[in-house]
Amino acid sequence: SVAEKNKKEVYIDFCITSASCTSVEAWKKCGKFDEWLFIDLVDNEFCKRIRLSGYKILRLNEWVLDQEFGKIIPKSERKQKFWLAVSKLLHNQNFAKFSYKKFVSPLRVYYTNRNIIYANKKMKKYGRIGYENYNCKGYFGFIISFMIPSILRAQNKIAVIKATFDGIVDGAKSNPEQWTVKSGEKYA
C-alpha cells in the first residue's frame, strides 16, 4: 500500500532473497535454503518457513533492488495502453503482461513448473505457497497466469511446451520431506 511505502520500515510476509540480510541463526533453525529448488520459488518457500518459525521479515523502504525476470521489451504504445486498460478494467494484473514482449527461457519455465508442485507438497500442512507470484490462488490460476502466457509468448514454443511438461512430471514425481515447525521451540 502507499502508506506502507511511505514508512521507512515495514514488516512483510515475503521478500526476494537477493540483497536480503538474513540472520544465520534463523537460516539454520528453519532448515536453510532448499537447494533442490535451485532457482524459482526459493524465496517463497524460505520466507514461509521463516515466518512459521516465529521470525519476522523487515523491509527497509529506503533501498531498492531493480531486478527483472528475463528480458522484457515494451510493445507499441497502443498495445501497451490496451493491455494495461484491460488489466485495470478486470482488476487482474496478469493481463498487463501482454503489454510487453518477454523472452521466455525454457529452463526457467521448467523450474517454475517443477517447483510450484514440489513446494506445495513440502509445505502442504501450512497452506498454498508460490501462487502469489503469479497473481493467483491455486494451481488452476497458475495454469492461466503462468503456463499459458509462457507458451503464447515464447519464441521457441516447442521448447517451452517440453519444459512445461517436464517440469510438471518432475514436480509430480518429487517426494519432498514434509516440513514442520519444530514443536516446543520458539525461535524469535
Model region roles, listed by residue range:
Residues V42-D43, N135-F140, G184:
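Short, conserved alpha-helical segments within structured domains
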Residues K56-V160:
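Active-site-adjacent helix/loop segment of glycosyltransferases
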Residues G54, N120-K124, A172-W179:
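A general structural signal marking secondary-structure boundaries and capping sites
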Residues S150-A188:
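Membrane-interface aromatic/basic loop that binds lipid-linked glycans or pyrophosphate carriers
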